[in-house]
């Protein structure tokens, strides 16, 4: 089942905003631990999921599919961000 356009637009907006949040992060000393950063990023993902979940439209299965796609996209962005953070920690 394809996502309805409203949900596609909402997911796209959320992904852009999340990416902006990640790109605004400045790594500096003293750095927090990798585990702490993972916790922070997981909290951000949960915040975005909960915020956008309330705005999804359509039948429940359409909302669930949109939410699953959104979560996958946020997790992909998070993994890339955390890789950059790990590299920062190694170079410090």
UniProtKB/Swiss-Prot annotation:
Pfam families: AHSP (PF09236)
Protein name per UniProt: Alpha-hemoglobin-stabilizing protein
Highest taxon, organism lineage: Eukaryota
GO MF annotation list: hemoglobin binding
One GO BP: erythrocyte differentiation
Localization, UniProt: Cytoplasm
Keywords for the protein's UniProt record, in alphabetical order: Chaperone, Cytoplasm
Subunit description: Monomer. Forms a heterodimer with free alpha-hemoglobin. Does not bind beta-hemoglobin nor alpha(2)beta(2) hemoglobin A.
One cellular component term from this protein's GO annotations in UniProt: cytoplasm
Predominant location category: cytoplasm
InterPro entries linked: A_Hb_stabilising_prot, AHSP_sf
Family to which this protein belongs: Belongs to the AHSP family.
Chain's role: Acts as a chaperone to prevent the harmful aggregation of alpha-hemoglobin during normal erythroid cell development. Specifically protects free alpha-hemoglobin from precipitation.
Keyword Cell division: no
């Amino acid at each position: 089942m394809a996502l309805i356009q409203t949900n596609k637009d909402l997911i796209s907006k959320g992904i852009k905003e999340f990416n902006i949040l990640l790109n605004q992060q400045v790594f500096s000393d003293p750095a927090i631990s990798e585990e702490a950063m993972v916790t922070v990023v997981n909290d951000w993902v949960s915040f975005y999921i909960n915020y956008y979940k309330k705005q999804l439209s359509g039948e429940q299965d359409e909302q669930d599919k949109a939410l699953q796609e959104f979560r996958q996209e946020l997790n992909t962005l998070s993994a890339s961000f955390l890789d950059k953070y790990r590299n920062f920690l190694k170079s410090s």
